[in-house]
Amino acid sequence: MRFADITGQDDLKRHLAQTVDAGRVSHAQLFTGASGFGTLALAVAYVQYLCCRYRRNGDSCGECPDCRQIEALAHPDLHLVFPVNKQGKKSGEVIRSDEFLPQFRTLFAERRGYFSPQEWYDRLDLGKTLKGMIAAREADEIIRKLSFKSFEADYKTMLVWLPETMNEEAANKILKILEEPWERTLFILVSEHPDRLLPTIVSRTQEVCVPRIAPEVLEREAFARGVADPLQARNMARLADGDLLELGHLVAGESDAQRKEHFDLFCSLMRLSYNDKHLELVTWAEDAAQLSREQQRGFLRDAARLLRESYMLHAGIREISYLWGEELAFCTKFAPFVGSQNIEPLIAEIESASAQIAQNGNPTIVFTHFALSVSKMIKHL
C-alpha cells in the first residue's frame, strides 16, 4: 500500500516519508486514531515506504518485490498481531493471530485497509457480544518471531493492530522488548484507544497521531462515489466527522435508518429527562441496552453530535450548524436547555458511557446511570 492510496492526510504522509529519508526511524511507534481516519492503512504504507528499494517522490514504488509482499501483508519480515477469538472456544484453548491471517489479509485487501474492529469481529463470526483479544501466549509468539534474523528487508517489523485488546499479562510481557529491542527491529502499534494501554507501553513509544480527514477531502470523496448534489456532499462530509468509513455508510444510505433510530432515542431521552420521568428513563435504558454494542456506541456518538449542534444553536452560531429536517426542528426547540454550564458535563458523561460499553460493561447498568445523570444535567442552566 502506497501513501498515494491513503485518502487525505497529506501533511502526515509527507512527515512520515521525511523521517525515513532522514534516517529518523523510532524503533517503537504508536499510531493513534479511528479506523476511518486511515490509521491501519497509513501504518502499512509507512512500513512499505521504509522497506521499498526504489522510493521516489516521497512514496514507495509499489512494484518491487518488497512493496508487493507488504501490500499483500505477506512479507516474511512483516509480522502481524491482531485481536482474535471464536465461538465455542474451549477452556484453556490457545488462539493466535496466525490462525486467522488469511481472513485478515482478505479483509484488508477488500477494504484497502479501512475497516473497523466490529467489521473484523463480524468476519470472525463472533456475534453481538463476543470480542477479540490478544492473549499472553501471543506475546510469547511476538518475542519468538522477533528473535530471528530478518529474511530480506533491513528491518523486522511487528505490526500490532488494536494493542488495547491485550490483557495485562500480554502487555507486561512485551515491555522489555519494547524498551530494548533487537537491532533493526521495528514495533508499530495501531490503536484506536491509546488511553486503554498501559502507561508504561505508551511511554516506550513515539506517538503518531492520525487526525480526522479534512471535510473538503471527504466532500471530494463523496463526489467521487456518485453524490451529485454539492449541498448533499457537503452535509455528508460534515456528518462523517473526518471518518471515511462513516462517509461510506452515508453515501450508501446505510446510516439513514440507524441515524433515525438514534435520533428517536435521543429525543425520547431528552424529553423524559426534562420531565423527570425517572421510571420511564429506566425503561429507556433497558431498550438502549438491547442494541448491539457497536450500535450503542454509535448512538452515543450521535447524541454527542446533536448536543454539540444544539449548543451552537444556543450560542447563536447557526451558520456553522449542519442540521436539517427533523433534527434541526428538534434541536432548535431543545437548544435553550444546552448551555455553557452543562454542555461539558453532558459530553463527559457520554464519553464515560462509551468507554464503559467498549470495556464490556453491563449495558443496562451503564445506560441507567447515563440516563439518570443526563436528567440531572438538562435543567442545570
Where are these regions (language model features)?
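Conserved adenine-binding aromatic site and its adjacent loop/helix in ATP-hydrolyzing domains
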Residues: R144, K176, S203
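Charged, glycine-rich active-site and insertion segments that engage polyanionic ligands
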Residues: R2-Y49, R55-N57, P65-Q69, E183-L186, ...
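Secondary-structure boundary motif
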Residues: F148-F151, E180, A224
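Conserved Walker B catalytic segment
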Residues: K156-R184, H193
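Clamp-loader machinery-focused feature within the broader ASCE/P-loop NTPase space
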Residues: R2-E169
